[in-house]
Every structure is written in C-alpha cells, then in structure tokens.
Amino acid sequence: KLQDDLPPVPFEKIRASIEASFEQPLEALWSEFDPVPIGAASIAQVHRATTTDGRQVAVKVLRPGVRERFARDIDTYEWAAAHLESFGVEAARLRPRLVIANFKRWTNRELDLRREAASASELAEHMVGTEGYEIPGIDWDRTNGRVMTVDWIDGIKISNTEALKAAGHDTDEIASRLVLAFLKQAIAAGFFHADMHQGNLFVKADGTIAAIDFGIMGRIDRRARMWLAEILYGLTTGNYRRVAEIHFEAQYVPSYHNVDEFATALRAVGEPMRGKPVSELSVGQMLDGLFAITRDFDMQTQPHLLLLQKTMVMVEGIATQLNPKINMWDVSAPYVRSWIRDELGPEAAIADRIREDTQTLLRIPELVRRIEDRFPPKGGAPELPPLPDVEL
C-alpha cells in the first residue's frame, strides 16, 4: 500500500529490475524517469515518468525480492492460524486458516502487476457512465508482472479537506459520490476496489474522484449481492425480521437458532444508529454489538465478505471526514432500493428465466453425449469389463 512511509529501494536496483523484466534499456520505453519515487511501500514503489511518445505516466515497480519474502512470511501465518484453530470452538468459529488462505490469494494477486492492471481495466468497464469517478488508463506496452504503467493523475488527496475546500470543491457532494461509487461497484458490478484508503483516492480539478492502486480487489457473486442489498435496505428501513430471514437463507446463521430472536438481536444494534449522522455513532460499540451477535448465534466468519466489510469501514471513514454530518443510510437507501427494484421486478425475473432456460438448452447436447458415452447405443462398443485383481 503506497502510504509514502517506507524508505525507497535505490534507483539502481529499480532500473535493473525494470530492464531485466522488459529485456531492454529503460530509455527505450521512457524518455524521462524520475529516480525519486513519489511513494514507497512494502510491496512496491511508484515513479513519475514520461513515455517516449510524450505521455505523463506513473510507473509502479515491485520491490526486488518481495515475492520471496512474502512466501517466507505466509508460512509463519499459516502455522499460527493452524495452532489458533486448535485452541477451541471459539477460535475455530473465526476460521483463521481460511482467512489466511484468502489473504495469501489476495496478496499473490497483488504481487503480479499484470493482474492488477487487468483489475483496473475491468473495473473501468464496470464504471463506464458513472459521472465523477475515474480509473486511470493502462499502458499495456509498458506493463508486465513486475512493472505497471498507468496514466498520470493530477489531483488533491481526498483526505486533504482543507485543500479541497480552498480549491472550491463541495466536500459534502464528494462524500456522497464516493459512497454511491462504492455501492455501484459492490452491489451492481460485484467487483470492487478493496483498498479505498485515503492515499489511493484523489480529486481532480473538475471534481472527479480518481482511484489508484488496484492490487486488492473484491468479488461478490450475484446471489450474495442480492442478500447484501436486501440486508442494507432492511437495516435502513428497520425491517429487522427480513434481515434476519436473509441471514438464515444465506446459511450465515445455523438453522437451529430462532429467526425472531436473531431479528431482536439485530434491532438492539440497529435502532440506536437509525437517523443519526455518523459523527454521533460509536463505530466501536456497533462492532462490539455485531461481534456479540456472531458469537451468540454461532456464526462463522465469512472470508468472502471480509474485504467488503473492511472496504465499507474505509469508505465510511473518508466520507465522514469529508462531511461529518453525512448519514450513510440516507445516502445508500435510494440507490439500494432502485437496484433491488430493477433486479427483483417482473422484467428482471423474465430475463433471468430466459437466461436460465437458454443455458439449460445449451447443456442438452453435452448431456446427451455423456449419457451415450456411459450407455452406448445398440451396436456401439461395449463397456470394458472390470480387470481382476492379481497378486504379483
């Protein structure tokens, strides 16, 4: 994560790494390359450069040896997680081994800059038509597993509220737009930027939010997104019974528990939050309440939702800094309600049925072939007899 807080790798090593990965001199790709990085972190560092055709770009380069160091570190994490699970039921419920397995997968993706570039490209496609939110373009000719080149972004860090106001930006509007952009990614696209901390978001001169650093991405399938949207909408409207039912339908709560009791537990956490700006809420108390619910109702950790939960906290923190009076529920509810209507309405149901029927029809020829392979038609080759066991 590029938080400008680690000493950079000497430029000689960075140059050598770039030239080895492209098998050509650095000057063949960039006419100018600033040897002083604009950001350095544990995994990579970023340099400003100008391509040979005159474009301003940012070049992200993996730290030499970072892949080998991570491979050593993850062995320690896996050992610790396995021992933690052996301590008892409460530790096993948190599924630390599965959490570490997901962390390993996420980080291995982050260590391949081609994957990061592909993620940025995919997210840009999902966000087409979203006003005021931008993903920098990828320079594929100057990108490989160890180096990624993207369009240069000029802007103010989203965390610098004073500079944003001095430049004439409406920080309240930016806060709402950031929340809606995240909801579009997570709920509509099912593919979201999972590293939306303050160092990875900028505001351009025209007010556009520009995101960078796509090494960590989250993906949610359509069914989980439907559950998520209904849960969010249920919490915003106080329909705790429906939220509880969804948790049971998704099998997040073991079936031997009572739906109504779970709904009451949710109400105890949700009601104090409704109608209040984030500045008046205690996130710590809310998380304590939710964690108590997971414990009391034997809910296992859902690793596929950990990234989503982490990102939601990040987005809420930034939005609150931009607009201390923002009410996340009020901003989210209209979008979530509209998405649910579009996805659950009659037109969507008909489209889903047509899609499912088409997929079934397309599978029929393959099913027939497999049946004939298992049960040949008359005159076909007979099935081979089983071979006897012979002791040698």
Report each predicted region and the residues it spans.
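Histidine-centered phosphotransfer motif of kinases
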Residues: 193
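Broad phosphate/nucleotide-binding scaffolds in NTP-utilizing and phosphate-metabolizing enzymes
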Residues: 1-190, 198, 202-392
